[in-house]
Each structure stands twice: as structure tokens, then as C-alpha cells.
Regions:
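Predominantly soluble domains enriched in secretory-pathway, periplasmic, or organellar proteins
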Residues: 5, 21-384
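C-terminal motif of bacterial Sec signal peptides marking the signal peptidase cleavage site
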Residues: 16-19
């Protein structure tokens, strides 16, 4: 796969931006030299680079895509508009999840109620799937599974609309089935023949949800509902038959936690006092960044952690070793290169202006940093 196709596509499309969008003000892509991820002439390089989805503040319609080319060591901001000059309003409002599956790139745009589907090699748009208030994605076989709040963005302790999981045929890009789960379902993960869905009840404060819905994939129905903890968020499945579920607490007297659910035993086997803003599984380690807001102190507490999934214990309070974490205002996203093991941390800063991405070597020392779009959040690695 030749990643130069992305840059060529961007350059070619810049010439037609004005004619296609006479009434829009479109920020052109900007290319910043950083550092390559390894020897530029290495023919065995497995990771071509990564896409970064910037969420953009709600209501601003400023979700954008960036791309890091690992071979050339260049970081390009805002590539979607140039690659797709005829698409009105670009990506949309609030980019909430990003994934590469097969040869396609999937960007979930929460408040635009859609999943944008692109060619992973060129970023060219292939189509979209419309799902109201969509939140997170997981894949299994020929299907994409998407959590949906189903209802409008309304804070209401008596919210009546249950959420659901949509089953999308990746070939036809159509929703083929839905199954009802709890209120405001967020994270979703696949393990074996089942889906694990975290119900948050995030619109219903102080009456948050506590449950995780378990869905049988072949039958596509809920087969179990497990009490986990308050206001659940992200979910990931490890290689040890365990599901890790983050609880955000209630921002007052119940703090955030990270729970480990043993699938075979059908019980919680670990309860860790860790704030999870984002987490990434690499081999047997979970890398975590946290931002714990308190409505009591009206302060935000930043944290980092590494958890070993086999011991089910926190093995480090940080994966940054050179003290440069003090430069990061709001650690918002984290990812680990599956080959080089470089660690990426995004900084949301004030959630209004452009953020930054920091690249750390496996030993935790800073390699490079560069500006991003607004609220940089979700990373998907492009493999050769």
C-alpha cells in the first residue's frame, strides 16, 4: 500500500476546493515535518501511519481528520475536506469514534447522526450509515455494531428512550437489525460470539445506569444484563477472557473505577480506583489517561496508569518518564503503535482551540509533538 496516494489525492483536490464550496470557509491541509517511526527505507514496515479524528466542540461542526505518515515523518492536518471537496459540511459535528476494518476507514460522527465510510488508503468517501446519536463501534465478521442513544441530546433524570445496538452490513452499508439495551449505551467490545455494551445513563443524572448488556451475536439478542458500576463508559476485551469496563462515577461522592469482568466466571474479579478518560490495550497492558472532574471541588485531576491484564493490577502510575506530562493540559486520547510501541497522547487543551499530539518512545521519553485539530481524540493505525 502506497501512502503517498493520500498526499497526492489531497494535493489534487486542493485546486477544486473553491469551485466546489464557494460559500464555505474550508481550512486547507497543513503538513508538518515531525519524525519518522523508524528507518525510512525499511521495506518491512508494517505500520504505514495513523489517522487521528479530532472531535470538535459540540455544535461547531468541526470534526476533522489528520494523518501521520510513519515513513516520511510528516503530520498532515485536516485531510478530509481536500480528499472530498464535493461533500457539504465536511465530516460533521463531534467525531466520537474511529476504526479501520479491512480496507475501509470508519469515522463515527455523533451529533451528525452518521458513520462516514472512506477508503483507508486515500480517505476518499465511499458512503455513510445514518444512526441517531451514535456513540461507539465494534466489528465482527462482515458486520459493524454501533451503540446508539436513540433519542435526542437532552439532560433529563426521567429520560424515557432506551438505547440500542445497530447491526450494519459492511458490504451494503445498511442497518440490518437493532437490539434494545439500556439507557445511553456507550462503549462496545467483541469477545467470542458475544458483544459487551456499557450502559451509561449519562443523560439521566443523578439516576445513572449501572449495567452492561451482553448480546449473543448469532441470535442478536440480549442474553444477560450485568450490574457493574455507576455511569459506565469505555469497554475493551483482552486476550484472557476478560472485559474491562470503565465507570465514571457521579462527579460527587462516587469516584471513577475500572472493573474487570471474567467472562467464564460471570463476575467482577478486579475493581481498580482508576479514572479512565481513554484506554488502549497493547499485548497484555492497558495504557490509560484520565481526567477526573469533581463537582465538589470544581477541579480537574489528571492521571496516567498502566494495568497488567493478567495480574489485574496497576503496574505503573505513568508511562511518561521524562517529566513532560506537565506540558499536557488535558490528556484526552491514548494509543500505542502495534510495531514500534511508540505511545501517543493527545491533549484537548481548552476543548475550543486546536490541541496537540505527543509521541513518546516505548521508554516514555518525548520524541515529538505537533498541533492537531480541535479536541484530538481517536486514533486508528493503517497497516500495510
Amino acid at each position: 500500500m502506497n501512502i503517498s496516494r493520500i498526499i497526492i489525492c489531497v494535493a489534487a483536490c486542493l485546486a477544486v476546493l473553491t469551485s466546489c464550496r464557494k460559500e464555505d470557509v474550508i481550512e486547507k491541509p497543513t503538513v508538518t515535518p515531525v519524525e519518522p517511526s523508524g528507518p525510512a527505507d525499511d521495506p518491512s514496515r508494517a505500520v504505514v501511519g495513523f489517522y487521528l479524528l479530532n472531535e470538535g466542540n459540540m455544535g461547531s461542526n468541526k470534526a476533522t481528520l489528520d494523518f501521520y505518515d510513519a515513513a516520511s515523518g510528516t503530520y498532515t492536518r485536516n485531510i478530509y475536506g481536500a480528499a472530498n471537496p464535493s461533500v457539504a459540511k465536511e465530516l460533521g459535528d463531534v467525531g466520537n469514534d474511529l476504526a479501520i476494518y479491512g480496507s475501509r476507514l470508519y469515522a463515527l460522527i455523533n451529533c451528525s447522526n452518521k458513520i462516514e465510510i472512506m477508503d483507508a488508503a486515500t480517505c476518499r468517501r465511499m458512503g455513510q450509515v445514518n444512526i441517531p446519536n451514535c456513540r461507539f463501534m465494534a466489528f465482527d465478521g462482515p458486520f459493524l455494531y454501533v451503540t446508539s442513544y436513540a433519542g435526542p441530546v437532552v439532560i433529563d433524570p426521567d429520560y424515557k428512550q432506551l438505547g440500542y445496538v445497530a447491526k450494519v452490513d459492511t458490504a451494503t452499508m445498511e442497518v440490518v437489525a437493532t437490539v434494545t439495551v439500556g439507557f445511553q449505551p456507550d462503549g462496545i467490545a467483541v469477545s467470542g460470539r458475544r458483544l459487551y455494551v456499557a450502559n451509561s445513563g449519562g443523560y439521566m443524572a443523578p439516576h445513572y445506569e449501572r449495567t452492561m448488556s451482553v448480546i449473543d451475536i448469532p441470535e442478536f439478542r440480549v442474553v444477560d444484563t450485568v450490574d457493574i458500576g455507576l455511569n459506565l463508559g469505555l469497554v475493551l476485551a483482552d486476550n484472557c477472557g476478560q472485559i474491562w469496563v470503565a465507570s465514571r462515577g457521579n462527579l460527587y461522592d462516587v469516584g471513577p473505577r475500572l472493573y474487570c469482568y471474567d467472562i467464564a466466571a460471570r463476575e467482577i474479579v478486579a475493581d481498580l480506583e482508576i479514572s479512565v478518560g481513554d484506554m488502549w490495550l497493547d499485548d497484555d497492558l492497558i495504557y490509560i489517561v484520565g481526567n477526573e472532574w469533581s463537582n465538589v471541588t470544581m477541579k480537574n485531576t489528571v492521571s496516567y496508569a498502566v494495568v497488567d491484564v493478567r495480574s489485574r493490577k496497576k503496574v505503573s502510575d505513568s508511562f511518561i518518564t521524562d517529566g513532560t506530562e506537565t506540558r499536557i493540559s488535558k490528556p484526552y486520547g491514548v494509543a500505542v503503535d502495534p510495531v514500534s510501541k511508540d505511545i501517543y497522547v493527545t491533549d484537548g487543551r481548552n476543548y475550543v482551540n486546536p490541541g496537540d499530539i505527543y509521541c513518546y518512545s516505548p521508554d516514555g521519553t518525548l520524541r515529538w509533538t505537533t498541533p492537531t485539530g480541535d479536541i484530538p481524540a481517536h486514533i486508528a493505525f493503517l497497516l500495510r
